[in-house]
């Protein structure tokens, strides 16, 4: 039974680790598509900057509420919901055709990704010894 419990702990930790790597990709993704956004959709440099910033602002603003939610409902549940929100935001960003949908999608990505690092901290603090 103990071995199975350790396997589950490490599996959840690895899932959160890969999710955090995905978070890093999502943070940098707007830098890759800036030329396409301006050429194909006609976005100005200000709009592109806002698109990139909104994700980071929503990420930062959600840190305290995310911590409260993780403490109340658990890291697994909240990180799962967060990744679903991020996924929907990413799909919306890939299919958007105006700046307002781009803004909404990046806010969703920021909100969704804000829980992953905190969930990792919670899991590590609860499950792994300090040694």
Label each residue range with its predicted role.
Residues 105-131:
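Cytoplasmic helix-loop-helix junction between adjacent transmembrane helices
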Residues 11-45, 66:
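Extracytoplasmic
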Residues 24, 28, 94, 110-118:
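Small-residue-rich segments within alpha-helical transmembrane domains of MFS-like 12-TM solute carriers
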Residues 61-100:
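Conserved MFS/SLC helix-loop-helix module at the cytosolic interface between two early adjacent transmembrane helices
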């Amino acid at each position: 039974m103990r071995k199975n419990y350790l396997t589950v702990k490490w599996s959840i930790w690895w899932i959160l680790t890969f999710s955090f790597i995905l978070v890093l990709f999502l943070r940098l993704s707007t830098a890759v598509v800036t030329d396409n956004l301006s050429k194909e959709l006609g976005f100005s440099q200000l709009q592109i900057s806002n698109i990139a910033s909104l994700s980071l602002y929503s990420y930062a603003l959600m840190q305290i509420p995310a911590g409260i939610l993780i403490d109340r409902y658990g890291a697994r549940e909240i990180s799962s919901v967060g990744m679903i929100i991020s996924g929907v935001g990413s799909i919306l960003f890939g299919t958007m055709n105006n700046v307002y949908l781009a803004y909404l999608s990046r806010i969703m990505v920021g909100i969704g990704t804000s829980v992953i690092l905190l969930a990792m901290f919670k899991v590590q603090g609860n499950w792994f010894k300090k040694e």
